[in-house]
Amino acid sequence: AIALGSPYCFQTTLESEYKSDIFGERGILLGAVHGIVEALYQRYRSQGMSQEEAFEQTAESVTGPISRIISHEGILAVYQQMDSDDKAKFEAAYVASYKPAKEVLQEIYDDVACGNEIRSVVNASNRYGEFPMGQIDGTEMWHVGENVRRQRVESEIPLNPTTAGVYCATMMAQIDVLLRA
């Protein structure tokens, strides 16, 4: 692992790796992120934000400053970099999101662990001809994102406290599910 550039190496099993990989993809590594940014995009749009601003406050915020801070300084640093008004918004979003996120993530983990998730994927592929899966990049948000990304100024990407609260709550919920597993 170290020869491949991994900074850490730990003992594991193939079963543990498969469970954590599939669970991770369904959770905060991919599936949950998509759900979070799509839901918050719709919320911000319903509150009057333009399409571009809603994209910046969701997808750009998560993939920009939120992820960068977590990668370099840890999850708590996201909260610590906010002023008191933004901390209150973060806290409200975190508290509202943690328990439902943990419940959904626990169900995902349980389905992966017992094999139901893999069976579901196989069954979905058998139905694909009649019920094709949609493309995630076909939504309004992702079309708007094409233009926003072209005009991106990295230093101007906002750290949205509500988006950060939901994202960090979901990340902590996933960590807690894995610690219990």
What does each model-found stretch correspond to?
Residues 14-28, 32, 153-166, 170:
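Catalytic alpha/beta core domains of metabolic enzymes, predominantly
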